[in-house]
Amino acid sequence: MDSPMEKFIQTYLTLLRDGDETVETSKLSESCRKEKLDMKQVNEWIALFDVDKDQKITFEEFCRGLGLKQNEMRIERNHIKTVQSGREQSLPEGVSIIASTMPKPKQVEVTQLFKDIYNEVKKDPDMNKVVKTFKSELERRYGRVWQVNAVTHSYWASFSHEPFQSIQFQYDNKIILAWRTPSN
């Protein structure tokens, strides 16, 4: 489930214009209202970005204001566009998503990565090796710092993560929890 911050970021990225990479504050407020976000919080966030009071928020201002990496937000924006266009791929066979804040294209990438590692190492019953390899590969592909857990029964979890960097899924008889925490 997306947090209010993730919904806000997704709303901004959806409205972002290609040419000049700006969003008008009025359009952002209107879209956030439609998404039923807390407008008091939205207005506080907008005030972080529009410091020059020109009623526009550039992509650079937005990322700087929230401490987000521009290159990662461009990737997230491309994922959003893929979903909106209907060109997204299906999840790998045998994978079911329990919860995720990742856009569907990234869910496909991450679950396929796990499935490949799991099936490669499956002959070795040491799940620790699978988890360590999966964590290392997530960090190589998506940056540091990832946390990975594998469980076989019920679980309860509460954790903080970077926007759009959390996934919980089941494959075979394993439940995998993975999320990225800030590295700074």
UniProtKB/Swiss-Prot annotation:
GO terms for molecular function: calcium ion binding. GO terms for biological process: microtubule-based process. One of its GO terms (cellular component) is dynein complex. Ca(2+) binds at D50, D52, D54, K56, E61. Pfam families: Dynein_light (PF01221), EF-hand_7 (PF13499). SMART domains: Dynein_light (SM01375), EFh (SM00054). CDD domains: DLC-like_TAL. Residues 37-72 form the EF-hand domain. This is Antigen Sm21.7. Keywords: Calcium, Metal-binding. InterPro entries: DLC_sf, Dynein_light_chain_typ-1/2, EF-hand-dom_pair, EF_Hand_1_Ca_BS, EF_hand_dom. The keyword Calcium applies. The lineage of its organism: Eukaryota, Metazoa, Spiralia, Lophotrochozoa, Platyhelminthes.
